[in-house]
């Protein structure tokens, strides 16, 4: 269902069962796949492709111009997979031609309220970014990584699979897989045992199948 107050650009491509809430704006060159739900007052700008069964809540801004002085109106992209949740006030920017020209988000990720994902970032699957965490340009979050509330990640950092960055961490270096970090500057505090156990259990289950 598309609410009568929503504004949809003529070039946008929406599958028939996509839901658009009141006063939301869907811009040019936006594609939204089946089962996705866009709440009220959301803004989605293109070129942006959004997969199936995503939920985008009120006042999220998805696919906005990169916050980079070098950006001069070039055509850059945002790609989003399936089954992601973008809570209230989340911002996700497109890429820049100086880097990948594309911001990429995988599937089954949770972006809590007021999270920021900058230009050219790559977010794999099953990532959690807790409220008010933010990542600068060209950051990569590997599968299952968790950023605690108010965590900040410096540009070009790689955050390893199933790692955990505690609340308020200021991350300026790469974080290895399965490692737990905290502090300003963030330092390694040991293994993320919860993530390690979950991953080991999952791998054992997959092997048994």
Predicted regions, residues:
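Acidic/polar active-site rim loop that often engages polyanionic ligands
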Residues: 188-194
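Conserved small/polar residues in nucleotide/adenosyl-binding loops
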Residues: 200-207
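Short, glycine/charged-rich beta-strand-loop motifs at protein surfaces that mediate ligand recognition
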Residues: 195-199
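Structural signal for interior beta-strand "rungs" in well-ordered beta-sheet cores
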Residues: 2-182, 186-187
């Amino acid at each position: 269902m598309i609410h009568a107050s929503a504004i949809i650009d003529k070039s946008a491509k929406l599958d028939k069962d996509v839901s658009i809430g009141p006063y939301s704006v869907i811009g040019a060159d936006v594609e939204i796949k089946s089962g996705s739900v866009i709440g009220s007052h959301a803004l989605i700008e293109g070129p942006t492709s959004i997969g199936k069964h995503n939920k985008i809540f009120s006042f999220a801004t998805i696919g906005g111009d990169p916050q980079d002085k070098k950006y001069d109106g070039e055509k850059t992209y945002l790609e989003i997979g399936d089954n992601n949740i973008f809570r209230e006030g989340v911002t996700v920017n497109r890429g820049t031609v100086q880097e990948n020209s594309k911001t990429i988000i995988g599937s089954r990720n949770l972006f809590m309220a007021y999270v920021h994902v900058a230009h050219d970032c790559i977010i794999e699957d099953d990532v959690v970014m807790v409220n008010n965490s933010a990542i600068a340009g060209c950051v990569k979050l590997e599968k299952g990584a968790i950023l605690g509330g108010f965590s900040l990640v410096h540009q070009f950092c790689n955050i390893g699979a199933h790692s955990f960055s505690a609340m308020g961490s200021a991350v300026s270096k790469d974080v290895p897989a399965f490692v737990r970090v905290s502090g300003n500057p963030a330092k390694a505090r040991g293994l993320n045992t919860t993530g390690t156990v979950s991953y080991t259990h999952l791998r054992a289950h997959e092997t048994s199948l």
